[in-house]
Amino acid sequence: MAKA
C-alpha cells in the first residue's frame, strides 16, 4: 500500500 502506497502512502502519500
From Swiss-Prot:
Enzyme Commission (EC) number: 1.2.5.3
The entry's keywords: 2Fe-2S, Iron, Iron-sulfur, Metal-binding, Oxidoreductase
Species lineage: Bacteria, Pseudomonadati, Pseudomonadota, Alphaproteobacteria, Hyphomicrobiales
Free-text remark on how the cofactor is bound: Binds 2 [2Fe-2S] clusters.
Subunit text: Heterotrimer consisting of a large, a medium and a small subunit.
The organism of origin for this protein: Pseudomonas carboxydohydrogena (Seliberia carboxydohydrogena)
Cofactor(s) in the UniProt record: [2Fe-2S] cluster
Protein purpose: Catalyzes the oxidation of carbon monoxide to carbon dioxide.
Entry protein name: Carbon monoxide dehydrogenase small chain
GO molecular function terms attached to this record: 2 iron, 2 sulfur cluster binding; carbon-monoxide oxygenase activity; metal ion binding
Source organism, top-level taxon: Bacteria
Signal peptide positions (record): none
Reactions catalysed, as given in the entry: CO + a quinone + H2O = a quinol + CO2
